[in-house]
Curated annotation (Swiss-Prot):
Function: Active on a wide variety of primary alcohols and their corresponding aldehydes, but not against ketones nor secondary alcohols. Active on aliphatic compounds up to 5 carbons in length and aromatic alcohols, less effective on branched-chain primary alcohols. Prefers NADPH to NADH. Its catalytic efficiency is greatest for aldehydes, suggesting the reduction of aromatic and medium-chain aliphatic aldehydes is its in vivo activity. Plays a role in tolerance to internally produced ethanol.
The keyword Cell membrane is annotated on this UniProt entry: no
Reactions catalysed, as given in the entry: a primary alcohol + NADP(+) = an aldehyde + NADPH + H(+)
Primary location class: cytoplasm
Biotechnology (record note): Can be used to make bioethanol by insertion of a cassette with Z.mobilis pyruvate decarboxylase and endogenous adhA (this gene) into 2 loci (slr0168 and phaAB). Up to 5.5 g/L, 212 mg/L/day, of ethanol can be produced.
GO cellular component: cytoplasm
Effect of deleting the gene: Unable to grow heterotrophically on glucose in the dark. Cells photobleach and have significantly reduced survival in 4% ethanol, reduced tolerance to internally produced ethanol.
Organism: Synechocystis sp. (strain ATCC 27184 / PCC 6803 / Kazusa)
Swiss-Prot/TrEMBL induction comment: Induced by salt stress (0.5 M NaCl) under control of rre1 and hik34. Transcription induced by 0.5 M NaCl, 0.5 M sorbitol, heat shock (45 degrees Celsius) and benzyl alcohol (a membrane fluidifier) but not H(2)O(2) or high-light treatment; the induction kinetics are not all the same. Response to all stresses is mediated (in part) by two-component system rre1 and hik34. Expressed at a low constitutive level, protein levels increase 2 hours after sorbitol exposure and 8 hours after NaCl exposure (at protein level). Protein levels do not change upon heat shock (followed for 24 hours).
Protein name as it appears in the record: Aldehyde reductase AdhA
CDD domains reported for this sequence: CAD1 (cd05283)
Top-level lineage group: Bacteria
Pfam families, alphabetized: ADH_N, ADH_zinc_N
Amino acid sequence: MIKAYAALEANGKLQPFEYDPGALGANEVEIEVQYCGVCHSDLSMINNEWGISNYPLVPGHEVVGTVAAMGEGVNHVEVGDLVGLGWHSGYCMTCHSCLSGYHNLCATAESTIVGHYGGFGDRVRAKGVSVVKLPKGIDLASAGPLFCGGITVFSPMVELSLKPTAKVAVIGIGGLGHLAVQFLRAWGCEVTAFTSSARKQTEVLELGAHHILDSTNPEAIASAEGKFDYIISTVNLKLDWNLYISTLAPQGHFHFVGVVLEPLDLNLFPLLMGQRSVSASPVGSPATIATMLDFAVRHDIKPVVEQFSFDQINEAIAHLESGKAHYRVVLSHSKN
């Protein structure tokens, strides 16, 4: 039996929950969980904000742990290996996206917390292809958020062929944005942070931003007209997108990684005349995750985390929901 924590209904508190996972599949890995990040997507699933939640719901998709068991078809990890698991717990492996290496775009990809019990427990299972071995030297306590927040901002840097000479702005310096700033600085880019938090300004500079602009001040935003080659938006609220797009240089690219549920209100003419573009992306493939982890270790990039024990799980969730979390929250089974 696997001991976990589950929401039994929308907006419900998490409760102890046991389930029998059945026989381990030939292509499955069972992970003994050491740490698991708490992401805003977990909150959305607990509260059924996206209308895709099934209860009992065991959240948790930023898993770090050791391989406890594996099926006979798994050969890239061994029992005892340190591994991580992110948003996806499996892929079809036969569609064009999978065969092209874009597993994260697989139309039938299995989510770790949608119709599947996630990592808020002592163990979790997933298809082997979605389980990524951790590189030596990585900090285990802070590695979990890299499997969602980290790859969410790193993947478009790879897919958009971001040049190290680019001028890049990040909207929102929270769980995603503080990682984007670190990755972009290490990539070689000139980084500007749009933030509404006066208290974060010194810290954002320490994380690697070259410039800061007040996102609550339209004049400050407008002062950057035509400046940026890329903008990465990490926020989940509606903003004046046309004002931000005015800060793109010709052929500039605006990329969404934060989930904004409201329809976008965009003026086409500035996009057309400046050959500017708008796009979005979800997480990344296992191969890109592995590349990101190596890059993070090489450049000493770490999520800033606050740690709670698993028996404080509802306290941790309330802390994140309140907006008081210092970037990322991680649950721990560690005795330390």
